[in-house]
Curated annotation (Swiss-Prot):
Compositional bias annotation for Acidic residues: 228-242, 705-716
Gene: hsp90a.1
Assembly information from the UniProt record: Homodimer. Interacts with unc45b and myosin.
Region (Required for homodimerization): 675-725
Compartments, record wording: Melanosome; Cytoplasm, Myofibril, Sarcomere, Z line; Cytoplasm, Myofibril, Sarcomere, A band; Cytoplasm, Perinuclear region
Motif TPR repeat-binding, residue numbers: 716-725
Stored CDD domains: HATPase_Hsp90-like (cd16927)
Record's compositionally biased regions (Basic and acidic residues): 243-253
Protein's recorded name: Heat shock protein HSP 90-alpha 1
Highest taxon of source: Eukaryota
Native source organism of the sequence: Danio rerio
Length: 725
């Protein structure tokens, strides 16, 4: 266009528009509120550029001529320290005049109001892109923004605003940009860090390193260059020339030597000067590893990516790289770390370590809906082709796409663990670190409970120092055995020596040792495995394989000891629900079992140690205790004889209480009044040593109530104790 007409057109065609009210309000909020993470503006502008490039690439699929105006699809960043500007250029689809006016100011996006409400409610500014208003984040760092854009179907236009409630649009008759958009940020004085090479690289690496188009940073730099003095400083040249004239009489004409001198002279007349040049650096050369074919990726590459993703100093233990195609399309790369984080189950910790990308654009890294809590140790990335780029947390919660992604991720994780289980050594390392997660999964994830139960490993009465699976246990079950037997407790030694496993071990029945607190919660949900019920050997109603003769013998013993059971129940009263003859004891005189639906002793211990426990629940879950006596034990047999001879014998009452309290301890319970129990033991020791009560001062210190602890009588009782022993 002729030069003379350019100026009038510029003046005439500058149009001023007012920002739509909600947008003006949003900009005011962005400008006047302090935000610590202002760097997200660059992520949003690069993301917008990537979207524009996606659009032109899509259009070119049906009409290749769309790319004629510019073949290369790219993003460029140009900082200018002198002018304090940062320019973001893309060769995307560009905007028409109407697009400029509508998209950048006069028509509010649906998310504008929602984002302002979220901001005022304390949401992070970094969520701005999820509401479709990411462009306005430019005003976090810029006092004025200029947008130059060219669409294939329109002329080149300039949009400009200093956020004063209005913006201008005018035709641009300057240098053509071909196609695309050029955003020039005139930075605020205190935001000049964003023209520094190091800072720009840092922000791009953090937020946009996996954008699917090359992002090139153009930096003006200086370098030293050797130049001839004729090309350099003329004044020095003249001085040298004057010096040469002065020295001319001394120069001899010696042929070859003259050539050497002239060479030396030429060398001396070189000088280093600084020159400016543009250094172009591609910032996202690392193409997303998850978009590549898994067959082409080495373990070293996976290891490097895992370390950069997780900041872990160790290599990963296992990796799963897969893509899902069809109605839904996404790629995922999942890693199992070598060790569990120390704060894995802390409530304040972010719920997962999987980064969510949408078409290579990072969306968020703590999307709770992406993976269940019990898999929160898995690290990796998920890149969806179907989710919208401007998706919010609220939308994610309702997203059917995300639910399908989640289901696939869980399935693939379980497949990965199953594959890992085939390598015994590596699975042992994995299980040591993450067994709690599997058990938590069994408690929470009913759909995958069967698969998760295959991953469990336990010590058993027959496994020695090796942990075995439930499948191994079932394969070793006796033909007459109907159930899977287990016992819960604090340590392997404690449960192995427990009175509850005596009969089972004698009969050659394998018992699973569950010695982690979370096992109690796990077996509440894992009722059966492979059609076999899991049965606790510490609860009432234990069914053991027995023949008709054994059943008949048991019935006879029940009848024989029925009276003793009644006497013991009367003595213990509310402390116990009932007293029965046991079928599980061999060498112990008695034990305390709990009701089928009540807590085990181990669970009661765990619940008592909870800082925020509910005491009302404690009441009814711990109330039902049953005392089981061993009819084959001499203590019980002798006690029966004495009780039948005189059921009001005070020694019988004292011995029954002592037996009960000792059984509580050996069965894993705690005593409500340990001091009274201790005093009973001390008095037994005194009797054994022949010490008279009058010689002791212990009674003066703590004399229990007479009704709680009947007085034992002198020598006669000593002989009784000998009989019991």
């Amino acid at each position: 266009m002729p030069e003379k007409s350019a100026q009038p057109v510029m003046e005439e065609e500058v149009e001023t528009f007012a920002f739509q009210a909600e947008i003006a309000q949003l900009m005011s909020l962005i400008i006047n509120t302090f935000y610590s993470n202002k760097e997200i503006f660059l992520r949003e502008l690069i993301s917008n550029s990537s979207d524009a490039l996606d659009k032109i690439r899509y259009e070119s699929l049906t009409d290749p001529s769309k790319l004629d105006s510019c073949k290369d699809l790219k993003i460029e960043l140009i900082p200018d320290q002198k002018e304090r500007t940062l320019t973001i250029i893309d060769t995307g689809i560009g905007m028409t005049k109407a697009d400029l006016i509508n998209n950048l100011g006069t028509i509010a996006k649906s998310g504008t109001k929602a984002f302002m409400e979220a901001l005022q409610a304390g949401a992070d500014i970094s969520m701005i892109g999820q509401f479709g208003v990411g462009f306005y984040s430019a005003y976090l760092v810029a006092e004025k923004v200029t947008v130059i854009t060219k669409h294939n179907d329109d002329e080149q236009y300039i949009w400009e605003s200093a956020a004063g409630g209005s913006f201008t649009v005018k035709p641009d008759f300057g240098e053509s940009i071909g196609r695309g958009t050029k955003v020039i940020l005139h930075l605020k004085e205190d935001q000049s860090e964003y023209v520094e090479e190091k800072r720009i690289k840092e922000v791009v690496k953090k937020h946009s390193q996996f954008i699917g188009y090359p992002i090139t940073l153009y930096i003006e730099k200086q370098r030293e260059k050797e130049v001839d003095l004729e090309e350099g400083e003329k004044q020095e040249e003249e001085e040298v020339a004057a010096g040469e004239d002065k020295d001319k009489p001394k120069i001899e004409d010696l042929g070859a030597d003259e050539d050497e001198d002239s060479k030396d002279g030429k060398n001396k007349r070189k000088k280093k000067v600084k020159e400016k040049y543009i250094d172009a650096q591609e910032l996202n050369k690392t193409k997303p590893i998850w978009t590549r074919n898994p067959d082409d990726i080495t373990n070293e590459e996976y290891g490097e990516f895992y370390k950069s993703l997780s900041n872990d100093w160790e290599d990963h233990l296992a990796v799963k790289h897969f893509s899902v195609e069809g109605q839904l399309e996404f790629r995922a790369l999942l890693f199992v770390p070598r060790r569990a984080a120390f704060d894995l189950f802390e409530n304040k910790k972010k719920r997962n370590n999987i980064k969510l990308y949408v078409r290579r654009v990072f969306i968020m890294d703590n999307c709770e809906e992406l993976i269940p809590e019990y898999l929160n140790f898995i690290k990796g990335v998920v890149d969806s082709e179907d989710l919208p780029l401007n998706i919010s947390r609220e939308m994610l919660q309702q997203s059917k796409i995300l639910k399908v992604i989640r289901k696939n991720l869980v399935k693939k994780c379980l497949d990965l663990f199953t594959e890992l289980a085939e390598d015994k050594d590596n699975y042992k390392k994995y299980y040591e670190q993450f067994s709690k997660n599997i058990k938590l999964g069994i408690h929470e994830d009913s759909q995958n409970r069967k698969k998760l139960s295959d991953l469990l490993r336990y010590y058993t009465s027959a496994s020695g120092d090796e942990m075995v699976s439930l499948k191994d246990y079932v394969s070793r079950m006796k033909d007459t055995q109907k159930h899977i037997y287990y016992i819960t407790g604090e340590t392997k030694d404690q449960v192995a020596n427990s009175a509850f496993v005596e009969r089972l071990r004698k009969a050659g029945l394998e018992v699973i040792y569950m010695i982690e607190p979370i096992d109690e919660y796990c077996v509440q949900q894992l009722k059966e495995y492979d059609g076999k019920n899991l049965v606790s050997v510490t609860k009432e109603g234990l069914e053991l394989p027995e023949d008709e003769e054994e059943k008949k013998k048991q019935d006879e013993l029940k009848a024989k000891y029925e009276n003793l059971c009644k006497i013991m129940k009367d003595i213990l009263d509310k402390k116990i629900e009932k007293v029965t003859v046991s079928n599980r004891l061999v060498s112990s005189p008695c034990c305390i079992v709990t009701s089928t639906y009540g807590w085990t002793a181990n669970m009661e211990r765990i619940m008592k140690s909870q800082a925020l426990r509910d005491n009302s629940t404690m009441g009814y879950m711990t109330a039902k205790k049953h005392l089981e006596i061993n009819p084959a034990h001499p203590i019980v047999e002798t006690l029966r004889e004495k009780a039948e001879a005189d059921k009001n014998d005070k020694a019988v009452k004292d011995l029954v209480i002592l037996l009960f309290e000792t059984a509580l301890l050996s069965s894993g319970f705690t005593l409500d009044d340990p001091q009274t129990h201790a005093n009973r033991i001390y008095r037994m020791i005194k009797l054994g040593l022949g010490i008279d009560d009058d010689d002791s001062v212990v009674e003066e210190i703590s004399q229990p109530a007479e009704e709680d602890m009947p007085v034992l009588e002198g020598d006669d009782d000593t002989s009784r104790m000998e009989e019991v022993d």
